[in-house]
């Protein structure tokens, strides 16, 4: 019998296998149960996980908002599968749209009685955003887009608005970080003036297994037979 091994013989690792700590206990039920939730960037790495986790707590409606048709299609299918598996009554509403379109946002917030907003829509890939021909669009999306959805949320007296930010907003050294920091500053200013909406932010570091992060890149490179590449010789 040959002792040669194939790639298909290697057991797949879950993310839990790679993490040295236990999962953090969730405390989101009061913000999700029997509420209408709006998730911008719902098809992205972070937005889709927010959607999957919040859905388990039985909101009345969960509005999945994304500019990407294929990402929206995928997260809607995943949420429908969770709904069926757990026998939930939540209405799942996938909506194609752009946070830069303030008029459309106003229409949606008027149509749906939204209680909580989770704003995860952003351009986040540093090298792409840093390219001279992408800077303007990145700033429009990350700054103006955040400005639009936050103002609309305040105008419609949404209970809470959570902006998903990044650790790169701390003393930013690139366009992505600077654009997110400017968005943060606007959210902070709204929190001191908006009477009914509670605005807050959470800064993420590098999110394991997110799109464009090292794990999916490495897995793809290994599956193709290598080589596995890094961004700097000193890494």
For the regions a protein language model found, what residue spans apply to each?
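Hydrophobic/aromatic anchor residues within beta-strands of the central parallel beta-sheet
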Residues: 94, 138, 161, 199-202
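Glycine-rich "substrate-gating" loop/helix at the edge of Rossmann-like oxidoreductase active sites
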Residues: 205-210, 232-235
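Active-site-adjacent segment of SDR/Rossmann-fold oxidoreductases
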Residues: 189-197, 222-223
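Conserved Rossmann-fold NAD(P)-dependent oxidoreductase catalytic core, especially the SDR/UDP-sugar
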Residues: 2, 119-185, 189-190
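A conserved pocket-lining segment of Rossmann-fold NAD(P)-dependent short-chain dehydrogenase/reductase
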Residues: 217-235
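N-terminal Rossmann/SDR dinucleotide-binding element
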Residues: 2-113
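SDR active-site strand-loop-helix element
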Residues: 39-40, 65, 117-121, 161-166, ...
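A short helix->loop->beta-strand "cap" motif at the edges of active sites that frequently abuts
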Residues: 59-60, 156-160, 196-197
